Amino acid sequence: MGEYSSGFFMGDKPTNGRVLIVDDEADIRKVVRMALQKAGYDVLEAENGEKAIETINAGENRLLLDVVICDIRMPKINGVEAIAYFRSNYPRVPLIVLTGFPDTDMATSFLRQGVVDYLVKPVEGEKLREAVARAMEQRELARL
């Protein structure tokens, strides 16, 4: 199935795709998860980059991600390191940065590195869903 899972089934329920949320704040992960599940996405969670790497490489999750949403400042493996890992090992999986730090230089740097969007917390559910939909659309266009 490659790096993509769009249109796959979880049990009897079709989903719009699988998204991994990487953030050290449980409340943020919960809000993001609820916003994306409302739009029909299957959501995985990790509290830091180390757990994200474990999650993306584990069993049925391996290579079955459509989008990764990643915070920057986290313990253990931070977002910068996690994003570098994803870019190098899963180059077709779109990355969205979701951070509490509205830094234009940082945003520009990440966008130049191939991150598809840079969102600042708190983010509205609709804006988040739109960013994920755009990321998935870009990924699908890249497959053609």
Which residues make up each language-model segment?
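Non-catalytic signal-transmission and effector/linker regions of two-component phosphorelay proteins
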Residues: 1-20, 62, 129, 133-144
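The feature encodes the CheY-like receiver
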Residues: 29, 72-75, 99, 103, ...
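Charged docking surfaces used in two-component/phosphorelay signaling
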Residues: 30-38
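Acidic, metal-coordinating helix/loop segments flanking the phosphotransfer/catalytic sites
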Residues: 45-67
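Acidic catalytic/metal-coordinating carboxylates
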Residues: 47-51, 78-81, 99-102
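Short amphipathic alpha-helix used as the core "switch/output" element in two-component signaling
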Residues: 54-57, 80-92, 109
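C-terminal output helix
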Residues: 105, 123-132
